[in-house]
Amino acid sequence: AFVEKVYIPDLLAVASFYKDWAAIGAGVGNYMSYGEFQNDNVSNTTNCWLPAGYIKNKDLSKVLPVDQKKVTEDVAHAWYKYSGGDDKALHPYDGETNPNYTGPKPPYEFLDTNKKYTWVKGIRYDGLSTEVGPLSRMLIAYASGHKRIKEVVGMVLQKLGVGPAALFSTLGRTAARGIETLVTAEMLPVWIAELDATIKGGDLRIHNNEKWDPSTWPKEAKGYGFHEAPRGALGHWVVIKDGKVANYQCVVPGGWNSSPRDAKGQRGPFEAALIDTPIKDPNKPLEILRTIHSFDPCMACAIHVVDSDWSEIIKVRVV
């Protein structure tokens, strides 16, 4: 009720005063979703309530299938080093995470973007900088013919008096989060009823344990798992040898969206979305925050720091 009676009306009311932002903050124009809320087997991402897919160059007439083999990580502008050279991107199965800070000594005010300037790797799909998150999910569902999402997107566009092109913007990104919240909330009673019926039917399984026992594993194995976190596409890749983890890489939503430039000079979604943003007061660049906030950024999610001895790394005290 809150989403329908408060969130969406407030979203539309505020957005109506910022319709110029329907032409600002577009970003890279490439969008991906791994799919979420599977309709049958949890491993079947081709049959999801929120469909999987890839939209290239804002082309809503064609939704491409997602192929995990096309995901790579680039460190040309990130503070890491690859054993085979920093100019070649690696697939997560072959991924390396070797910290190599070459930036200025803190504290500093500026970073040279022609060099390495971030701890975030340059994540790419088929060599392309790609946005993930609510906007990507809603665009792919809309372009895939999802009935309810097409209805709600159409309603929002009509009430704001803008066309589908407005979706590729800061305003569109913000609206997509509200649209997704509404349609997902509408489905909750359905899913809860399904869960209730399943439990009453005696099915209490919470996971697939067919390959849970390490003794059943081959000498060498590889696997990956996809999930749509609220912020976007989340992927885990693992390589197992002799029953032990030989390599593991986690490619997270914050990494996709906050990616730096790659070896080819392609900007990541954050950077690309800020191009041509009008700034009223350079001393108070609220417009920059407006676009970055539309991605719901989380740098603590993009980069994880873990001590191998499980010692405390840093303590932050908020007073």
Task: Kindly give the residue locations of the regions a language model identified.
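C-terminal, well-structured subdomains that either form a transmembrane helix-short loop-helix hairpin
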Residues: 234-239
